[in-house]
Amino acid sequence: MLHLPVLPVTGNISSGDYASTYSHSNESARPGYYQVFLERYGVNAELTSTLRCAYHKYTFRPDDDKKVLVDITRTNNGVRDWSIQKVDDYTFSGNQDAEGNIRFYAVSNYKIEDIRQLKNGEHEVSVVSFADSKGSKPLELKIGFSFVSIDNAKMNLEQEMKDKSFAQV
């Protein structure tokens, strides 16, 4: 999950100002599970994973449009190249070439409306917006990773999480 920083967001954001505060009293962690309430966005974020996949579950306020910010343009080691693209109505994929080249394949339970880029000086982020996303149903992202190819990232996702719920993972 380190190579693909994903942050659930709402409202207007910029590539230079999107961090959220949180309280340790609204955070919990145990092996295989992490949860935090993001105060700025009013989102409860839950994460779990398998060996080569991540499962994100974001519970937004019912009146908020659901979006995620994907920040693959920087790492501790510097990014040489990156890409993110919509594959189909529910899927996006891409890569980040930093110290190694990691590919990802992400499937959402909401239809993807668009993926747009926000740039502030030299820093650029991607914002994935979801269609008809208001309501209490959480946004769930299943993300497969591979150092070989996007096809392998998809295969890893299908092998490790295909029909599993968040609780099953």
Segments (PLM) and residue ranges:
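Accessory carbohydrate-recognition regions in carbohydrate-active enzymes
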Residues: 1-169
